[in-house]
């Protein structure tokens, strides 16, 4: 579906943005999250300039995103290593089983 104009409130300011209907709930949740972040920053930093608060919030979100990307990359590398180890273990077990069943003089029939 195509995006529809939607009105949201961010830190007391009305904004009209385009949003696909199926993403409206996510947009509203993001707006609530941003409002909370801005309010927390205002209290914590005592900065009253809205523009400055928005930039600080944007920097914080970018930093959090970078940290999550690092975590995801580390997790993926860890999983790849575990998969390789599991593959090696399986291959080794299959080789050993092949040696057991292929020994001369040993018949399991």
Curated annotation (Swiss-Prot):
UniProt keyword Transmembrane helix present: no
InterPro entries tied to this protein: Cell_div_ZapA-like (IPR007838), Cell_div_ZapA-like_sf (IPR036192), Cell_div_ZapA_eubact (IPR023771), Cell_div_ZapA_N (IPR042233)
Location in the cell: Cytoplasm
Protein name: Cell division protein ZapA
Gene transcribed to yield this protein: zapA
Domain of life: Bacteria
GO cellular component: cell division site; cell septum; cytosol; plasma membrane
Gene Ontology biological process: division septum assembly; FtsZ-dependent cytokinesis; septin ring assembly
Cited function: Activator of cell division through the inhibition of FtsZ GTPase activity, therefore promoting FtsZ assembly into bundles of protofilaments necessary for the formation of the division Z ring. It is recruited early at mid-cell but it is not essential for cell division.
A Pfam family it matches: ZapA
Classification via SUPFAM superfamilies: Cell division protein ZapA-like (SSF102829)
């Amino acid at each position: 579906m195509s995006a529809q104009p939607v009105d949201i409130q961010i830190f007391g300011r009305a904004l009209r943005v385009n949003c696909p209907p199926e993403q409206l709930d996510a947009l509203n949740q993001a707006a609530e999250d941003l409002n909370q972040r801005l309010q927390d920053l205002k209290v914590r930093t005592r900065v009253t300039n809205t523009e400055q608060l928005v930039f600080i919030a944007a920097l914080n979100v970018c930093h959090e995103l970078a940290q999550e990307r690092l975590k995801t990359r580390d997790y993926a590398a860890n999983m790849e290593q575990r998969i390789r180890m599991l593959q090696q273990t399986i291959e080794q077990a299959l080789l050993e089983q092949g040696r057991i069943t292929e020994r001369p003089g040993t018949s399991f029939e």
